[in-house]
Amino acid sequence: MKFVDEATIIVEAGKGGHGCLSFRREKYVPKGGPDGGDGGDGGSVYLEADSALNTLIDYRFQRKYKAQNGEPGAGRNCTGTKGEDLVLPVPVGTTVVDMDTHEVLGDLTKEGQRLKVAQGGFHGLGNTRFKSSVNRAPRQTSKGSEGEARNLRLELKVLADVGLLGLPNAGKSTFIRSVSAARPKVADYPFTTLVPNLGVVSVQAHQSFVIADIPGLIEGAAEGAGLGIRFLKHLVRTRLLLHLVDVAPYDGSSPADAVRAIAHELEKFSETLASRPRWLVLNKVDMVAEEDREAHCQAIVDELGWEGPVFRISALSGEGTKPLVQAVMRWIEEQAEQEADNPDFAEQEAARRRRMDEEARQKIEADRQARRAARNADDDDDFDDDDYDVEVVYAPE
């Protein structure tokens, strides 16, 4: 199934049912009082997180959704039936944004979590409601109100504990295949991975974490080069970044330059995301002669001036992957324990995630506006007014 991580939809809640104008009329009761019932409330629209879904593709084919209207009231003080609520399933990890106000309405991060996005209309009142001591036969009713309507943008960000960074062909997909049951496509050409892939890494019984592999970045990605930066938003929810680098690139390029290029693109996308804990993973060490391996890897670390954790692995053979995933598991457990025991730390972490979300949204929106402006400029060039005044000269036969 095609992976779609953004969709725009229009939701409209149901209208409230109108109140009823009615009077009691029975045998031997020629002048009964008012008995018009209220209308029913209109149905509301909800979004519900569903773990069985992993894409927003269904919302690309149908964009308009409307809840049921409330039924009008009836005589004998019968209240109209309430309109049925409309519940739209979305993948876990979906952010809902009001396109008109740019307000973030909510984040659906847990299975079964619901978010009301359009309030149903209020019911109208029947004439019974307007009876008083001075008005025994009211002919006044009220109409049900309109349901709320909204233009929404749905943004899916995958939920993962660990995110993989690196240039195309750095071995990210091979690594996730090596440590989990995920089976992303692997080939010897750039941009084999076109959509994010998730894998569950089981370290031992009841100890596991989720890892996300996104399409590779290249220099200039923040300006739209390669696959651009649209997939970087999927790293916003991660706790830890693993930066994979090929220690023996086939084109002879510098591994240190590759690391710096990705770090630069990350900073341009989100400074908060760039400040996330990031570990350096030197991959494909089996491509370097064993006697030169230590010196070669250390030279890369020295050139970068890297002060964080460094791991040397071969994703293809599995060499060094077990110590890496064990270290990641320990780090994640320590972070979770610290968040549980320290409310201040938990609040700082939540604030950091909100900043990353906002920075990512602003960057992606700016990128979207730039692409739209470029397309409009191209269209204008195709319709130059001077084209209609071209002089046609016929060559003599």
UniProtKB/Swiss-Prot annotation:
Residues 1-159 form the Obg domain. Its cofactor is Mg(2+). Mg(2+) binds at S173, T193. One of its GO terms (biological process) is ribosome biogenesis. The keyword Magnesium applies. Signal peptide: none annotated. GO terms for cellular component: cytoplasm. Its main location: cytoplasm. Residues 336-347, 378-390 have a biased composition (Acidic residues). Residues 160-333 form the OBG-type G domain. Its EC number is 3.6.5.-. Keywords: Cytoplasm, GTP-binding, Hydrolase, Magnesium, Metal-binding, Nucleotide-binding. Residues 129-144 have a biased composition (Polar residues). Residues 349-370 have a biased composition (Basic and acidic residues). GTP binds at residues 166-173, 191-195, 213-216, 283-286, 314-316. Residues 128-148, 336-397 are annotated as: Disordered. It comes from the Bacteria. It is found in: Cytoplasm. One of its GO terms (molecular function) is magnesium ion binding. PANTHER family: DEVELOPMENTALLY REGULATED GTP-BINDING PROTEIN-RELATED, MITOCHONDRIAL RIBOSOME-ASSOCIATED GTPASE 2. Belongs to the TRAFAC class OBG-HflX-like GTPase superfamily. OBG GTPase family. Monomer. An essential GTPase which binds GTP, GDP and possibly (p)ppGpp with moderate affinity, with high nucleotide exchange rates and a fairly low GTP hydrolysis rate. Plays a role in control of the cell cycle, stress response, ribosome biogenesis and in those bacteria that undergo differentiation, in morphogenesis control. This is GTPase Obg. The lineage of its organism: Bacteria, Pseudomonadati, Pseudomonadota, Gammaproteobacteria, Pseudomonadales.
